[in-house]
Amino acid sequence: MSVCKLLEQVSAECELGPYGLVSLKRFFYDAYSQCIEGSIFDGIKMDLVTFAEDLILSDFLDEQLIGVRILQQLATSKGSARDTLRKLGTNPRSIERAVEMLNWKRHEEEEVRKCAAEFNLLGLHILKKLARDHDNCGKIGNARGLLAKIVEFTHVSPTLLLNPSASDSQVRSVKRALQVIKMLVYTTGATGKALRRDVAENVFTVSNLRGVLQHGHQRMELQKLAMDVLTGMAMDERAKETIVGTGGVVKLLLSIFFNAGECELGNEAGEALAMLALESEASCAAILKRADVLDQLASALDAHHARGLNAMRVLRNLCAYSGEEHRTRLSTVTKAMPTVLGATMTGRDKILEVSVGLTTQICRFVDIEQFTAELRRAGLNERAYVERLVGILRQYRYPEIRVPRMRRFVVQQIAWLMTSSTRRDGGGFVDLLRELGMRQLLEAIAETTSEVECYHVFSGSVPIGKHRESFSAIVDTALQLLAAGQDTAGAGAGGESVS
């Protein structure tokens, strides 16, 4: 068999396309040179992927073109794609160069740019795989210009989003870029904190996400990813400021949450809003700009599980973190109390946790007589409600990471009941709590409090957003109130309005 025939056969088997012969001739020439100049083993160890990576890092255009052609073909070939992507993933310099090639402007570099554009779709796929590893996320964030280029891929014109027959490769590049950014902003620990800030500090990030939300009705998958990214970013205080400061984002999230025909889409919007409102007066003010927002949230409380859960989360955070100037308006949420109390009586896990938490916030706007009246409206009496709270504490004898604030919210509500009870009603809830063994329960809880119960949310195992008052201090206050058996208005957990 002649050398040319052999090269043609290898090119066909490697699926190197029309430029296969040129690429292979250069490969074997370099392998031969390695054998002559060094050891024969140097030439034998060479492979096409490493060879191509070396070429795209070259300063010569013809070598760069050969390299990018080889990588493009190998990375799209069914037989070699997996191994090629795995090998490329260990060399950030190659990915950086491919990204850099997109910015080349000279006419003679047009083919390189075209190959690089196709290759970058694969590059985003590589980055997505790399981002599954915590250490790699840090490397992606530190690679010069790489994060900015990933964000650049999230920019998409309204025409493309509104066109159902738009190029699949264009849509896929936006999708993969959003997937990579989502993985970066959900990275745990100090690396994640730095990445969330880096993503937020890019002036194009939030405006690009806004464009997807605003025009992506035909691309719901992209909208979901955009909202996932916003939720992850909102775990950082400075990122929240950037999101709220970008016009129209909160308004779009509210519109999607209240009007989305697709449940999952509405759920993503609700999660983003709840995270934005957590410990952020500015975010709460932005949400309250919508005139009917409280009515809409109240009507969503008894919706299906996820929608009702997120409505409660948003409403609780609005009550807890809005400025004093919104107090009068927020007091209207008391009309939702029967629905919230009903969720406490029948709910489980997260629904139960947030319903009790919302109750503690609504109680800031009522006195004990009004609260008792709301119990009646919900078809309950004092004993049934207190028995439910006692039952929750007995069920959750130890803290649970799934519902880290469960016991905190219940003890806060118990403290409010005791603080608000008057001597005129003979001790009211205090006597009832004593009768049902609350002292023994609280003493047992005091022995099992955990640092887990001092935070709002977690990024992996890393806590985010610490409560102002420790849970152990709240338990101690409740025990003191129970022992005193008298009105101690203004003391303890009932006064922790923004816990």
Where are these regions (language model features)?
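Elongated alpha-helical scaffolds that mediate protein-protein interactions in large eukaryotic proteins
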Residues: 3-47, 53-58, 62-66, 72-96, ...
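Alpha-helical solenoid repeats of the armadillo/HEAT superfamily
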Residues: 23, 61-73, 106-129, 158-189, ...
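Amphipathic alpha-helical repeat scaffolds
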Residues: 37, 53-54, 99, 128, ...
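Amphipathic alpha-helical segments within extended alpha-helical solenoids and repeat-rich scaffolds
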Residues: 41-46, 52, 88-105, 117, ...
